[in-house]
Each structure stands twice: as C-alpha cells, then as structure tokens.
Amino acid sequence: MATSFYSSSFKRIKVSGGVVFLSLLTFFNTFAQNNILVFQSDFGLKDGAVSAMKGVAMGVSPDLKLFDITHEIPAYNIWEAAYRLVQTAPYWPTGTVFVSVCDPGVGTERKSVVLLTKSGHYFVTPDNGTLTLIAEQLGIREVREIDEVRNRRRNSNESYTFHGRDVYAFTGARLASKTITYEQIGQKLPNQVVSIPYQKPSFAQGRVQGTIPILDIQYGNVWTDIDKKLFNQLEIKMGDAIQVQVFNGNDKIYEGTVKYVNTFGEVKEGVDVGYFNSLLNFSLGVNMNSFSAKYKVFSGSTWHIILSK
C-alpha cells in the first residue's frame, strides 16, 4: 500500500509493493533549493560594504551563486527597495534567497525576518515595509524572525550598524547553502508583515486611479501599477488621447493628455505618450526625452495618478 508524507515538495519513487512519496525536505524541514543568493541594498558601490556582505556569504559556502538586483536604492528609501524586489523576484527560480538591506532603523527594535512566499522564494530583510509589495503579489506562506543568537556572524555582537553583513548576509547564505533549514531561522510569526500604505489601483465613475511606485530611472519614464485589465475598462483605443492627472499627496503636479501607443517609435520625437511597460503596467513617457524631468513628476507611495477618456 502506498504511503504519503505531506510537505511542500515531493518526489515519487517506485518500490516493491507500490509507490512511496518521499519528501524532498528532511523531517518536514524546508530547505532553499538552488544555492542562489541575490542581494540588494541602499549601500551604493563606492565603498566596501557590498563586498563585505558577499565575503561573509562566500565564507559560509564557496559554492553559492551570488547575484545583485541593485545597490543604488536611494538612501533610506524603503518603498523603492520594496518595488525593486517585486519588479525582479518573480523571474527568479523557486527556492532563490534574496537579501534586501534598506535599514534606516538598524540596531533598533524592528524585527529581522525571513519571509517564505507562496511562490517558494525567500526574503531576508528588516520587517520595515520592504516586504509590502512582495507579500501582496507572491503571497505569504510563512514568516520567521531571525534568531540572532544562532544566526549571526561570530564575534559581531558589538556591531550595531551593519546587520546587512552580520545578520542578513550571514543568515541568507546559510539558508541558500542548506546549512540551515527555514525552520532553524527562528520562531514562527503571524502571517503578516509591516506594510507601507499606498493608493491601490481602482476603477470608478469612468476613471482609473493608481500609484506611481517607481520611475524608469535611465529614461525618465513614469511607471504606474495600473494593469491592462483595469485600464481597458476605460475603453480607450490605440492612438486615442488619454486624460492624465498626477498628484503628490493632495497637490496636483501635472494635468494633460498623452497619446496611447504601443511603443515610442510610433510618434515624433518629443511627443508625450502613454504605453504599457515590460511589466504590462501603464506608463508615461516622452519619445527621446524624460517625462519625469519635463513635468517634475516623481514616484513613491504618496504619488498617484488618475486616467480618463
């Protein structure tokens, strides 16, 4: 008779007398799966902070595969750290471990956690709002608080301002290298994280509203969180004009029209356009120019947009 052992990952093998499902996770513990460790921070690359984190990780296991999202998060900008995670993490393989360090509260009572998402990705970070968008998009399977007695770099207890190196890189490396299981991170917490409030996308009375979470920095395009399904409720056709209003809090920053296009080359240089970016979210741009610089439109949890015919 076949016997099943229930966990989050299984393989099936044939044995004499039937089929047995064996958990890939020893004794129901959860291991990261692929030795991949991905970093992001607001440290910049002008000094040795990022290299120190990677050195700690390689000291845990030289077999780790280390990658970066970015280390150019503006200093203390937790919202942008949250967005860069959700922009990139869904494209990484299941089992990937991410270390995100944008930590203006370093050394205080804020919790250090590892989030396991329903997609099977791990996020090692301070619980300060960094997980806002990841938790919404990928879902929360479990949250654990890092036990710094067991999961902290040796002889680092006198350091209070570099948890990126001493706690997050160290713990992330141990998890990614299967030195520890997810359950060995620390105590299980309620399935919730600190969340930054923002305007959720919505449609009402012939208008679509959303947030401007980020800029396409290199080109000055303005990215929103309005997807095609929501936008299509406006019944705007390709080539039509879109009425746009942009606010920062209660202050109106921009009001005007843009042409709805698939891509920039459909209009002359300098023409304002509305299009869908590579994440299939509505965006504002100027052919061969910066919409952000032209109209002083920026991004963050307080920036929101209204679209209409």
Where are these regions (language model features)?
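Bacterial N-terminal signal peptides
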Residues: 16-29
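Active-site histidine-anchored catalytic micro-motif
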Residues: 35-36, 48, 60-66, 76-83, ...
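Short, solvent-exposed amphipathic alpha-helices that sit
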Residues: 49-57
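Anionic-ligand-binding alpha/beta catalytic cores of soluble enzymes and soluble regulatory domains
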Residues: 156-238
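A conserved acidic, glycine/proline-rich C-terminal tail/linker
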Residues: 224-295
